UniProtKB/Swiss-Prot annotation:
Binding site residues for a divalent metal cation: 15-16, 104
Note on cofactor: Manganese or magnesium. Binds 1 divalent metal ion per monomer in the absence of substrate. May bind a second metal ion after substrate binding.
Entry GO CC: cytoplasm; ribonuclease H2 complex
Nuclease is among the record's keywords: yes
Keywords from the named record: Cytoplasm, Endonuclease, Hydrolase, Manganese, Metal-binding, Nuclease
Name of this protein: Ribonuclease HII
Species for this entry: Neorickettsia sennetsu (strain ATCC VR-367 / Miyayama)
Upper taxonomic lineage: Bacteria, Pseudomonadati, Pseudomonadota, Alphaproteobacteria, Rickettsiales
Location of the protein in the cell: Cytoplasm
Length: 195
């Protein structure tokens, strides 16, 4: 396979999913795409069926790796630092070291000096195929994780809300309380604990 390059070498795109959730880990993905793969959009604009189809295509035609930060890490270091840690873990798990790293958003990873070029790109998931691909793989991975947790905790309907603060999730929190998978320092969960 031939992988996309900049003048500096291999390009990795990085994106995360789950930063604003009330439950579950934050999941990041790093992707180095093959030259012939043109990703149509990021995970937020694709239907579930299209996203799953592209997930399989990306997994088969890229170097890719997942990094996660647990609820405990989110609670200990805050969501921003936990997100950056998940991104760093994803990059470190790639089977090759990219030269250029493109990160969706405004933040730069703490170990940026390891790479020749690191750029944060606001709305990068609308611009760069590598970031679009990373968003798709991260979302499908996290969605599957939350669907698995839903089997043990069906009251919270994580299969549907993926841990976000939907009305039904908040109602379940009020009725059934907080689990070990909830982020206790996030305001809606914290309010439930103070009741």
């Amino acid at each position: 396979m031939v992988y996309r390059k900049s003048e500096n070498g291999l390009i990795a795109g990085v994106d995360e999913v789950g930063r604003g959730c009330l439950a579950g880990p934050v999941v990041a993905c790093a992707v180095i795409l093959t030259e012939n793969l043109a990703i149509p959009g990021d995970s937020k604009v694709l239907s579930r069926a299209v996203r799953l189809s592209w997930y399989e295509e990306i997994i088969s035609n890229s170097y890719n790796a997942i990094g996660m930060s647990s609820v405990k890490e989110i609670e200990t270091m805050n969501i921003l630092n936990a997100t950056l840690l998940a991104m760093e873990r994803a990059l470190e798990r790639l089977p090759v070291v990219p030269t250029t790293v493109l990160i969706d958003g405004r933040d730069i990873i703490n170990n940026a000096a390891k790479y020749k070029e690191v750029k944060s790109v606001v709305s990068g998931d609308k611009i760069y195929g590598e970031i679009k691909a990373a968003s798709i793989v991260a979302k499908v991975t996290r969605d599957r994780l939350m669907e698995g947790l839903d089997l043990t905790y069906p009251y919270y309907r994580w299969k549907f809300n993926k841990g976000y603060g939907t009305k039904e999730h908040l109602e379940a929190l009020a009725k059934y309380g907080v689990t070990d998978h909830h982020r206790r320092k996030f305001a809606p969960v914290k309010r439930m604990l103070l009741r």
